[in-house]
């Protein structure tokens, strides 16, 4: 969950709207939800459920309603290498590469990052690498750090500085794109992101659903921002709407169901590093 949400808090928010939404038609209800709930998991759940209901009512696949020109195709998804000592991360990277994952995402802390990336590169010399700096580079020479990681084959860096300190990136010349994650919650943040970042990471639990995520993707493209689509830990049901938005993304990080002990039946398949709709 995002920002301290829980299943119970989300359910309460949704139940409080039942009497308001029941008299509305599905499109009216979906429009109303955008203002009745703040961005977050509750609005995401309700918004996506209403998209699904509308698709059933009109008898069209959801991808058509969402404005896609063709049915969604399989996508290469990142597999996340959890933070650990370099030797453990090297071993995890080697295992992931052996399972067919060609894009790995590393969690970093601002301390020992180069050593960790170097170890992962040794464990998986042929994969693509992206990293999430987790707001940890405020005290570092950001240009030097980005250049060092680029030399190790890193092709993108997420959220190098803390939320609210985005101006630290003003004038920074990075050899690889810098993307906003925590600094980009919804479309209201795009103006700031266009000033300091090269792209954004859209997560439906941040944005508050498919409606806002599609809007963000359109407006990001208009601003010249590169697009990544990520996820919180969730089943294939939670990933499915993000999979539609991800069709237009340069980087896809939808490995949430893999990290669960058990996914729902008829969920996505993960084959050779690709996420494939059932």
Question: What residue ranges belong to the model's regions?
Answer:
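Conserved beta-strand positions in the central sheet of alpha/beta enzyme cores
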Residues: 103-105, 158, 201-203, 228, ...
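Flexible C-terminal active-site loop/helix
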Residues: 230-278
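A general structural motif
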Residues: 158-162, 178-188, 204-212, 260
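Metal-dependent enolase-superfamily TIM-barrel catalytic cores that perform enediolate-based chemistry
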Residues: 63-176
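Catalytic cores of alpha/beta
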Residues: 139-149, 186-196, 208, 216-217, ...
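Conserved, mostly hydrophobic/aromatic
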Residues: 46, 59, 104, 132, ...
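Metal- or metallocofactor-binding catalytic centers and their adjacent structured scaffolds
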Residues: 1-58
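Anion (oxyanion) recognition and catalysis
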Residues: 56, 172, 221, 246
């Amino acid at each position: 969950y995002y920002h301290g949400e829980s299943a119970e808090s989300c359910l309460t928010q949704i139940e409080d709207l039942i009497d308001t939404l029941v008299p509305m038609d599905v499109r009216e209800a979906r429009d109303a939800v955008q203002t009745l709930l703040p961005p977050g998991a509750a609005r995401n759940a309700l918004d996506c459920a209403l998209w699904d209901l509308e698709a059933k009512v009109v008898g069209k696949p959801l991808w058509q309603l969402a404005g896609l020109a063709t049915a969604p195709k399989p996508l290469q998804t990142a597999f996340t290498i959890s933070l650990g000592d370099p030797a453990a991360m090297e071993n995890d990277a080697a295992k992931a590469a052996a399972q067919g994952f060609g894009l790995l995402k590393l969690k970093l802390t601002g301390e020992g990052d180069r050593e960790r990336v170097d170890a992962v590169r040794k464990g998986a010399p042929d994969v693509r690498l992206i990293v999430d700096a987790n707001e940890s580079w405020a005290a570092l020479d950001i240009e030097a750090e980005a250049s060092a990681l680029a030399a190790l084959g890193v092709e993108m860096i997420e959220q190098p500085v803390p939320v609210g300190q985005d101006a630290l990136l003003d004038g920074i010349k990075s050899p690889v794109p810098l993307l906003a994650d925590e600094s980009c919650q919804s479309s209201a943040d795009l103006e700031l992101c266009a000033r300091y970042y090269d792209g954004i990471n859209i997560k439906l639990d941040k944005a508050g659903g498919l409606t806002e995520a599609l809007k963000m993707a359109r407006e990001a493209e208009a601003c010249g921002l590169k697009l990544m689509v990520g996820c919180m830990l969730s089943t294939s049901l939670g990933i499915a709407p993000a999979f539609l938005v991800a069709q237009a993304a340069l980087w896809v990080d939808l490995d949430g169901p893999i990290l669960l002990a058990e996914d729902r039946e008829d969920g996505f398949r993960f084959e050779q590093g690709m996420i494939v709709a059932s």
